[in-house]
């Protein structure tokens, strides 16, 4: 799955979360950008302790931003939908 080029889609909530971090904590925003790059390279492995979300569809994953906050994304063969970047799922 790793070397497939996928389209990245930022859902409205995810974009809103990025705006929040841009205003409130640029260090976290930069970490989110690092996580986005890692997800695009290898969606199911890498930094941030990737894990599937059991209560969602099998294609929904999360990675740790901080102890409190997670990035949540959905993986398909064609694209990766970034869903949220604040709070826990």
Label the model's feature ranges.
Residues 37-64:
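A short, surface-exposed loop/turn module that caps and links secondary-structure elements
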Residues 1-7, 15-33, 53-54, 62-70, ...:
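Enriched for short, Lys/Arg-rich terminal
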Residues 7-8, 46:
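Residues that recognize and position ribonucleotide moieties
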């Amino acid at each position: 799955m790793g070397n497939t080029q996928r389209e990245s889609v930022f859902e409205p909530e995810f974009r809103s979360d990025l705006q929040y971090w841009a205003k409130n904590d640029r260090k976290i925003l930069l970490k989110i950008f690092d996580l986005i790059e890692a997800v695009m390279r290898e969606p199911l492995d890498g930094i941030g302790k990737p894990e599937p979300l059991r209560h969602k569809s099998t294609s929904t994953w999360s990675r740790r931003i901080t102890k409190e906050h997670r990035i949540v994304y959905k993986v398909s063969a064609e694209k990766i939908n970034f869903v949220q970047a604040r709070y826990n799922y």
